[in-house]
Structure formats: C-alpha cells, structure tokens
C-alpha cells in the first residue's frame, strides 16, 4: 500500500498544474475602487492646494502690495459660477477642471522661468505649488479613468508665453496667476463636494 501511495505522489508531482489551482494572472490585480473614496481624495488634494495658494497669494500681497485687479489674457476664464452649481455634471466638471489646472500649471512653470530677481525669494513656494498642481492633475486623470468617464481631448500645443515686459510685469503676472488659481480651486472644491452627493 505504501508503494502505491508513493507511486501516486510521484506521478502527481510530474503534473502540478493538474492538482494545484491556478493562481491569479500575472500583473497587479485590478481592485475595484469606490468612486466616492476617489472623489474624497481629489477633494482633499484640491483643498490642500487651495490653502497653499491662499497662503502664497498673501505672501505676494505682503511683499509686493498691488491694488486693483490683475489680469493675464492667457489665463483661463472661470467657467462656473454659484448659479450653475445645480446643473453640474461630473464628466464636464472633471474635464474642464483638468484643462484649466493644466493651464495654471504651465503658467506657474513660466513664472518660475521668466520671473526676475524680485520673485526669486518665492522660488521654493512656487516650486512646491507646481509639484502639488502636478499631483492633483494626476489624481483627476486617475479619477476619470476609475469612473470610466470620457477622457479629455489631447492637450492642444500651448501658446508660448513671452517674458514679462518688466519686473513690475512679472509681479502683476504672479498676482494674476495666484488670484485666478485661487478662484478656480475654490469653485472646484464646491463643485466636487456637490457632485459627490450624486454618486
């Protein structure tokens, strides 16, 4: 009897795939993610970036006081208002938010390259702001993928931004970029929180 058992074990060992259940396919398993948790993560990143932007804008006002509105024609126009919150749809919000934030990302890059010596004292803060913007952009792209939403159209080639005409021009541009980004992020937090209730 022992000989028979040993013989059976030897035979079975020659074909392990016949007796061992197949394991998971190669590669990382696809874990289904809760869309509400993904949206929560995007909201937290947006709030954090909003706080950073508000703080940096306050530093700008302290170091370089400048009354009045500061505009930059190349910046995106705020697409939404309080009156349109009720009609928001998730695909449109995420797509527009990603496009607008990509524009601000490029403007911050430009500001770091083109700004004169006057803004060099804010270089660490501008660098951190750019890194957080990039992180939020990746999160939004992931969220759109997880929710199986239509992906944004390929980004159009960015129009090169010319250097500021003067040191004052770079300061005005910084005020405009930070002010516009602050408004966009403030709207984004409100819109994303409202859309979360509809998931």
From Swiss-Prot:
Keyword list, A-Z: Cytokine, Growth factor, Secreted, Signal
Cellular location(s): Secreted
Gene3D superfamilies tied to this protein: 1.20.1250.10
GO MF annotations, alphabetized: cytokine activity; growth factor activity; interleukin-11 receptor binding
GO cellular component: cytoplasm; extracellular space
A Pfam family hit: IL11
Top-rank lineage group of the source organism: Eukaryota
Gene symbol of the encoding locus: Il11
UniProt name for this protein: Interleukin-11
Family named by the database record: Belongs to the IL-6 superfamily.
First and last residue of the signal peptide: 1-21
SUPFAM superfamilies xrefs: 4-helical cytokines (SSF47266)
GO annotation (BP), single: interleukin-11-mediated signaling pathway
């Amino acid at each position: 009897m022992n000989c028979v058992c040993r013989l059976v074990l030897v035979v079975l060992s020659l074909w392990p795939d016949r007796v061992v259940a197949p394991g998971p396919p190669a590669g990382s398993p696809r874990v289904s993610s809760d869309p509400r948790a993904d949206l929560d993560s995007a909201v937290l990143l947006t709030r954090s970036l909003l706080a950073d932007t508000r703080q940096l804008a306050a530093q700008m006002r302290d170091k370089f006081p400048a009354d009045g509105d500061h505009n930059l024609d190349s910046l995106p126009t705020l697409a939404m208002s309080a009156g349109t919150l009720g009609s928001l749809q998730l695909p449109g919000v995420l797509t527009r938010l990603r496009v607008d934030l990509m524009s601000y990302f490029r403007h911050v890059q430009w500001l770091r390259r083109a700004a004169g010596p006057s803004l060099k004292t804010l270089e660490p803060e501008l660098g951190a702001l750019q890194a957080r913007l990039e992180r939020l952009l990746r999160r939004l792209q992931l969220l759109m993928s997880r929710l199986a939403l239509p992906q944004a159209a390929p980004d159009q080639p960015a129009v090169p931004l010319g250097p500021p005409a003067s040191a004052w021009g770079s300061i005005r541009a910084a005020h405009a970029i930070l002010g516009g980004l602050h408004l966009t992020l403030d709207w984004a937090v409100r819109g994303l929180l409202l859309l979360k209730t509809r998931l």
